[in-house]
C-alpha cells in the first residue's frame, strides 16, 4: 500500500504521485446546490453565465474581424500614400530643376512667348466650356421634345370621350404642360449659355492667331521649354490624381474602422446592461471589464460608492492578515474601504492577506509580475469590489 505523506494544506497525496498545480489567481467557485430530484447539474450546464454568453456572442468575433481588416487596410494604404506623395514631391523638384536649367539656356524668349501659350491655354478651356454648354443644350432640347409628346398623348386621352371629362387624363395633361414650360425655359437658358461661351471661344482663338503672327520668332525658340513644361504638368496631374484616390481610400478605411469600433462598444454596453439587470452576482463568478472598456466594470459603481460611504473613517488595521482558510465576517466586509485597500496594495507587493475575500468579492484588474516567495502564482494589483 502506498505510503501517504502530509503536505501543506491538509491534503494527503500517495508517495510517487504528483500533486496537481493550484493556480492561485483563480477564484474558487462555490458548489452549486442540487435541486430536489437530482436535476441541478443539468440545469447549470444548460444555463450559460453572462461571461460565457459574452464569449459566445458571434457579433463580437464578426466586428473584431472587421476591425482587424480595416486596420490592415489602413496600414497598407497609408504606406502607398506616403510612397505616392514622396514620388510626387520628387517629380516636382526634378521638373522645377530641369525647367530652370532650360530657361537659363533659352534666355528672354520664354517671357516674350509666354502670352501666346497663356492665350492657348485659355482658348482650350473656352473650347471645353463650349462643348459642355452644347451637351446641356442638347439635353434640354430632348427634354422639351419628350414633354411635348406627353402633352399630345394627354390631349388625345382627354378628347377620347367628349361626353365625360376624365380627371386622371386632366391631371396628366396639367402635369405635362408644366413639364413643357420648364423644358422650354431650360432650352432657352442653354441656348443663351451656348452662344455666350461660343463667342468667348472665338475671341480666344482670334487672340491666339494674332499672337502667333506677332511672336513667331520667340515662339519657335521657346518651344522646347513649354513642351517640357506641358509634359511635366501632365505627369504631375496623374500623380496628384493617384494621391487623391489613396487619400479617399484611407478615409473610407478609417470610417469602417470607426463603425466597427462603435459596434463593439454598443455590443459591450448591451451585454453589460444585461448583466446589471440580473438580480444577484454569483459568488464564484469573476466579473470582467466589457469589451472596449478602459478599466473596471461600470456595474460595480453603485456597490463601490456604497462601501466607501459606509466605511468612511474606518478600515483594516495594519498587520491584520487573513489566512487561506479564514473568511471575514459580515461586519468586517461592511467596514472594508476601497481607499484603504488601494493604499495597502501600494505599500506591499503581496496580496496574501486578500485571499480570504475571494468568496465574497470579485478581484479584477491588471496582472502583476510573479510574487516574491516560493509560489509561482500571480495576483492582481488593482481590485474592484
Swiss-Prot record:
Bias-annotated ranges (Basic residues): 376-385
Source species, domain of life: Eukaryota
Composition-biased stretches (Basic and acidic residues): 18-28
Bias (Low complexity): 318-328
Keywords tagged on the record: Coiled coil, Guanine-nucleotide releasing factor, Phosphoprotein
Annotated Pfam families: SH3BP5 (PF05276)
Positions bearing Phosphoserine: 30, 49, 343, 350, 358, 362
Sequence intervals crossing the membrane: none
MF terms in GO: guanyl-nucleotide exchange factor activity; protein kinase inhibitor activity
Annotated stretches, region: Disordered: 1-58, 272-328, 359-385
Entry's Gene Ontology cellular component terms: cytoplasm
Cited InterPro entries: SH3BP5 (IPR007940)
Main function: Functions as a guanine nucleotide exchange factor (GEF) for RAB11A.
Sequence similarity: Belongs to the SH3BP5 family.
Protein name: SH3 domain-binding protein 5-like
